[in-house]
A protein has these predicted regions:
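Domain-level signal for soluble alpha/beta catalytic cores
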Residues: 1-371
Length: 371
């Protein structure tokens, strides 16, 4: 069992572009020309291959590339009691493109059960060695809470939960159970992917909530509450990090805005060990909010974009790292791409070769900065 802990000086978020072999197998399965067992065999092969590539690239964290899921977040929610989904009706408008998502909603109280993702983790864990550790990525509890209170779901949710507080309580407890399942399977490095904070940054979000008569500070308090409730009673030697995202679908984004308005909550008060933060362009604002990060957290700067194939200027990235170090000590900083390469099956608009070139640049820069 590996004793390595994330994050590393050079790291990555988790998802990778799906190989053509896997895409073809999933299409064949959907068309009914291969069995589930045959699809699983191809998926196992592809996970084995992506882990090998991560090791060859010199990275210490290994993931399954999220190859076993269609969406970075929804598939995980389907693993709880009380949650149902259907193919149509879940589309979300991104910047210039409609994301084709599945409708995911409540049909009962949220409860934990034996979660299929734990079995996926067990397959990944076999590849750990002295130089690598398996990291598993799941959506943050706040993401599940947000999913169940969006306009198209709130009416259905109210059939089972009269108040948001009751919903938060059940989601938090269900996550506690699943976190313990991961730990029992040997997982000591878990990452919570969270678009909820990114969705409420900036003036546009504030104005949107004001128009609905909703106190945005109360929204922030609830997001913090459900995330921290889920982390109560976690194993002491389990590292849990959070990736704060503004949406990533086919190289488009969902929201824009600096971290200033949420830093007092997620940076200062969320009980995670590290924050993986998007900082690849001006949509993320400046580094000043990093001064709010509590001293027990590390920060992974997502300075290399996964949305575009062009490589960043190395010297400019190094300069930005040192700029960030004005607000948080350099020894608490790490480097990664700003997000995954394929948050959903469709993936971003770059090739596999360009994907690995991005990661090589991350490693090269980190080794120069933290000699």
């Amino acid at each position: 069992m590996s004793t390595l802990k994330t994050p590393f000086r050079y790291d990555f978020v988790g998802s990778f572009l799906r190989p053509e072999k896997l895409k073809a197998a999933k299409k064949a399965f959907e068309e009914g020309t291969i069995t589930k067992e045959e699809l699983d065999r191809v998926t196992d092969e592809c996970v084995t291959e992506i882990v090998a590539k991560q090791k060859v690239a010199g990275f210490h964290a290994i993931t399954d590339g999220e190859f076993r899921r269609k969406f970075w977040h929804l598939d995980f929610m389907w693993g709880f009691e009380g949650v149902a989904h259907e193919k149509d009706g879940g589309g979300v408008q991104f910047n210039g493109e409609m994301a084709d998502l599945e409708a995911t909603y409540l049909v009962g109280k949220v409860k934990a059960k034996a979660h299929p993702f734990v079995e996926y983790f067990k397959f990944l864990k076999q590849f750990e060695d002295e130089q690598t550790v398996a990291k598993y990525t799941i959506p943050a509890p706040a993401q599940m809470y947000q999913q169940m209170i969006v306009p198209q779901n709130i009416g259905q949710t109210r059939k089972f939960y009269v108040t948001d507080e009751e919903l938060i309580e059940d989601i938090g407890k269900a996550y506690q159970d699943v976190i313990k399942q991961f730990y029992a399977a040997g997982c000591c490095n878990l990452q919570l992917d969270d678009c909820t904070w990114g969705a409420i940054v900036g003036d546009a979000a504030k104005q949107r909530y004001q128009s609905l008569g909703v106190d945005i500070e109360e929204v922030k308090a609830r997001l913090l509450k459900v995330n921290n409730l889920a982390l109560e009673n976690r194993p002491e030697d389990m590292v849990i990090t959070s990736h704060i995202c503004r949406g990533n679908y086919h190289s488009t984004f969902f929201t824009s805005g600096p971290y200033d308005s949420v830093a007092d909550y997620v940076f200062a008060q969320e009980h995670v060990d590290a924050l993986l933060l998007e900082y690849d362009d001006e949509r993320s604002g400046g580094f000043a909010p990093l001064a709010k990060v509590s001293p027990d957290k590390k920060v992974v700067l997502g300075l290399i974009t996964t949305k575009k194939p062009e490589l960043e200027d190395k010297d400019k990235v190094i300069a930005r790292i040192h700029e960030a170090a004005k607000y948080i000590p350099l020894d608490r900083l790490c480097l990664s791409p700003q997000c995954g390469f394929a948050s959903c099956e469709i993936g971003n608009k770059l090739t596999e070769e360009q994907q690995w070139a991005k990661l090589a640049l991350v490693k090269e820069i980190a080794e120069e900065v933290w000699k």
